[in-house]
Amino acid sequence: MKQSKKSVLGLVAVVALSAPTVASSAVIVLTFEGVGDLNPVGEFYNGDGGPNYGVSFSPETLALVDSDVGGNGNFANEPSSSTVMFFLEADEAILNVAAGFTTGFSFFYSAAEAGTVRVYEGLNGAGALLASLNLAAQFNDRCVGDPTGAYCNWTAIGVAFAGTARSIDFGGAANFIGFDNITFGSDTPGVVPEPGSLALLGLGLVGLAMGRRRARR
């Protein structure tokens, strides 16, 4: 219960694929636009509403839309407006790519608490560990531009690896870390949408809006 109360002070603002699967060598960028505010990402990139890239996310993985455009997101300066990915009810999100991908992996992130990302050979975080990244807390460092949203610093990070990866484990404190422009096949994150051919009252990404939502249940 204590963890639940902590979570609602996070990334939500207090202040207010039927197409062929992606080849393992293709460079793909996931921006999460179109998933919808606080909706599960789930199979969106596996033919359920978005491009069919053969990419699935664990049930805890949610999309979050910037409060500037009517969502509950407590963030600013996101690399591709206006949606990011985060998790609220767990301390990790799992991404699976059944066909696998090679070369590298990269993304932008913003975090109030440290996190980790691990790349695995098998699905669901199984098999050999191919690469790992430690993510430092940096959510409000040297922010400029967009004045609304506590999570205003988005850092690009990536890693190259040998072999074929099929899953990624995004770890961190629930509601205190967000991700955007997740990129497969490159250790430099993309800053463009997915191609068709291929107020510090609350430090979390979601705040009072989510608290009210739970109270109604």
Where are these regions (language model features)?
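Generic detector of low-complexity/intrinsically disordered segments
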Residues: 11-13, 19, 64, 97, ...
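C-terminal membrane-anchoring or membrane-association module
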Residues: 209-217
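Intrinsically disordered, low-complexity segments
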Residues: 2-5, 16, 22-23, 54, ...
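Short, glycine/serine-rich, charged loops/turns that create anion-binding
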Residues: 111-112, 205, 215
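Surface-exposed, well-ordered secondary-structure segments
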Residues: 26-190
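Short, threonine-centered small-residue motifs that mark membrane-proximal processing/anchoring sites
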Residues: 7-28, 175-205
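Bacterial Sec-dependent N-terminal signal peptides
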Residues: 1-10, 217
